[in-house]
Amino acid sequence: MGKFPKDFLWGGATAANQCEGAYKEGGRGLSSVDVVPFGPDRFPVALGQLKMLDCDAEHFYPSHEAIDMYHHFKEDIKLFAEMGFRCYRLSIAWTRILPNGDDAQPNEEGLRFYEELFDECHKYGIEPLVTLCHFDTPIALIKKYGGWKDRRMVDAYAHYCEVLFQRFRGKVKYWLTFNEINMLLHMPFMGAGLLFAPGENVQQVKYQAAHHELVASAKAVKLAHAIMPDAMVGCMLAAGQFYPRTCAPADVQAAAEADRDNYFFIDVQSRGEYPVWAKKRIERAGIALQMEPGDEQLLKEGTVDFISFSYYSSRCTTVDPELMNKASGNAIMDAVKNPYLKASDWGWAIDPVGLRITMNSLYDRYQKPLFIVENGLGAVDKVEADGSIHDTYRIDYLRAHIEQMEKAINEDGLPLLGYTTWGPIDLVSASTGEMKKRYGFIYVDKDNEGKGTLARSRKDSFYWYKKVIASDGEDLA
């Protein structure tokens, strides 16, 4: 194996709503994920089909305690440092800073919490990479405005960003505006706090909300650069190349269109304007986007510095409606099973070469540095009698993907800033709400029903990843 650059940012990634817990502590307000329950109602709520804006006694809400990192962050960051992390991607909970989403004055207790967390990272030489909004629209703003369908969300978000940039300049260099921004179209409540009234034009609402998030992202980039001249601000895409199921031209065209659709948001964030095909699509659908004077100029001026993305699997598509389903590779996006690939316990296609293909696709399209900010294997881990966890399957998955990253850097010449695996510590799954779908190098004693001691322990992959980082990616054995 060739080596990675000496300044390569190895690390791991989490999200506040999947790990922090303490959902009512420290002055924190309620956010969208807090009302997304575990069980059969989870997807209807996440998709905006079932309205739930408060918690009830009938449901279990995994995010309320999560893995209680709010009270364990020093212990957890020390474990990250033991692995040799150079970077830790985390998100700030909007409602921990502004409990109602648009409060004139921020919650000092929330600011102090993140200040302590960043100081703990710097103590070990770990660079924070901060996601400003990771599936956590403030409930107060959903009730007040209907979430991102309303233009006033842009100013609320810009105010939130300015509070953070002013407070944490000098402590945080790398920022992401929205996590997996393209998920707005697939999980509209999780992604943008959207609910749909009977008879409402769903596509109109989604694309209007998308425009508001894109304008907000551009505002955040401009604010960050004005307040912190050395800051680097990225977009974040749920990525994964679409393959045609066959070489029939119709399937090839379907795959090309699926890729193009997936790139819609970051086309705008990276190039500063709506692509022509998107304008045509919106026009054909009869969608009348409300744009304010100056929006187009703002999008041009607020382009991102780098492209970050999550990659778990590639996807396969076809024009044959009988082959399409929603259970092969991703429960959210339509896909068809790829007969050439094995799948994870949750049906996600395992395709390391697809990562290299995706990286080349993104760089060819945007010519901006890349950053892989999520990649990992969700699996059921068995704890042995002596407490050990032999997760060789996770090591195999990550090794194969790191090998393809090395090829992309050294053979294809791609500029890759870093790699933060998803879930360096077990946390609540965003899609299913499960704990048994584990990604971590660190095991957390907690089950799907919320029972457990929350004790942390090292898996075999912990020691493996430590060795990978220490060798700059050269020793993957």
Describe the predicted segments one by one:
Residues 68, 72-93, 301-306:
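Catalytic domains of carbohydrate-active enzymes, especially glycoside hydrolases
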Residues 1-57, 81, 100-102, 111-477:
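Active-site region of glycoside hydrolase catalytic domains
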Residues 63, 70, 101-104, 345:
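Short, flexible active-site loop motifs that bind/organize anionic cofactors or intermediates
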Residues 58-72, 149-152:
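Active-site mouth loops of central-metabolism enzymes
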Residues 86, 95-97, 135-137:
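A short acidic, glycine/proline-enriched capping/turn motif at secondary-structure boundaries
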Residues 92-106:
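Glycine-rich, proline-tolerant flexible connector loops at the mouths of alpha/beta enzymes
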